[in-house]
Structures are given as C-alpha cells and as structure tokens.
Amino acid sequence: MSQLTHINAAGEAHMVDVSAKAETVREARAEAFVEMSAETLAMITEGRHHKGDVFATARIAGIQAAKRTWELIPLCHPLLLTKVEVHLEALTDSNRVRIESVCRLTGKTGVEMEALTAASVAALTIYDMCKAVQKDMVIGSVRLLEKTGGKSGHFKVDA
C-alpha cells in the first residue's frame, strides 16, 4: 500500500513539496448525484423554478469551486487550471441529477480534488436552490471517475 503523502515521519500534516516534480498534462473526472422527487426534477428541467436556471447556477458554482479548491481543502496547492467543465444531466427514470466535472492543467500535481470539489459544490448548489421546495433531497455517490497524468499514472473506475 502507498504511503500517505500529506503526513510526515512525525505524523504531522504538511503540504507536499512538488517543486522537483516534472510538469505533465493532468486531467481528472468526477461525478456526484442529487436524488429528489419527480416533481422537483420536473420543476428544474421545465424551467419553473422561481430562482432561475438551476443547472446554469450549479454549473457556474462548480466551476468556481474547482478554482478555489486550495482555499477549501487545507493541504491542496493553488493550481492554474486550464479547463473546468461541469455537465448536469436530469435522469428522469431515477429522479436524480447526475453531475460530471472535468478539470485539466499542465502542472506538478493532480486535479482530482478540484474535480471532486466541482461536482460536490454543484450538487450542494442544486440542494440550496431547491431546499424550499424539497428538504429531503439526497446528495451522494461523489467519486473520482478517472485521472490521467502524473507519477501514479492512469486510473479509471470500473464501469
């Protein structure tokens, strides 16, 4: 098993020194889901929400969150992201919204946390915008789908 990179020999948390690492293209994809009633999902997809376009707001929130991950997660590095995408899909058969984020850069550390943060904050934004209509929505299944680049190589979740 790999060692924890953010813990030193004394067991103290620290930010990893990446100064000697080579710059490579790195990309990560993550997803999250928001479960809700059919009525709430229809309100979103039909554009009937009084606060406006829920998906557009969640998309912008996810993009902004990816850019600010280093301010939210204590040991993350500030990164110069070159791409952030947040896709939202209404899954009417299961009354869920699927959120997928993609982050990319050329740099010395990966973008997994940025992708996970983007998907998570987009989900939280959907909850925030719809909580007046439905308080028992469930945010879940937040996970890394794929990452490329860097020393640890390629990772892809099994389908």
From Swiss-Prot:
It is an enzyme of class 4 (lyase). GO terms for biological process: Mo-molybdopterin cofactor biosynthetic process. Its EC number is 4.6.1.17. Keywords: Lyase, Molybdenum cofactor biosynthesis. The active site is at D128. One of its GO terms (molecular function) is cyclic pyranopterin monophosphate synthase activity. Substrate binds at L75, C76, H77, M113, E114. Pfam families: MoaC (PF01967). It catalyses: (8S)-3',8-cyclo-7,8-dihydroguanosine 5'-triphosphate = cyclic pyranopterin phosphate + diphosphate. InterPro entries: MoaC, MoaC_bact/euk, MoaC_sf, MoCo_biosynth_MoaA/MoaC, Mopterin_CF_biosynth-C_dom. Belongs to the MoaC family. Homohexamer; trimer of dimers. Catalyzes the conversion of (8S)-3',8-cyclo-7,8-dihydroguanosine 5'-triphosphate to cyclic pyranopterin monophosphate (cPMP). PANTHER family: MOLYBDENUM COFACTOR BIOSYNTHESIS PROTEIN 1, MOLYBDOPTERIN COFACTOR SYNTHESIS PROTEIN A. This is Cyclic pyranopterin monophosphate synthase. It comes from Proteus mirabilis (strain HI4320). The gene is moaC.
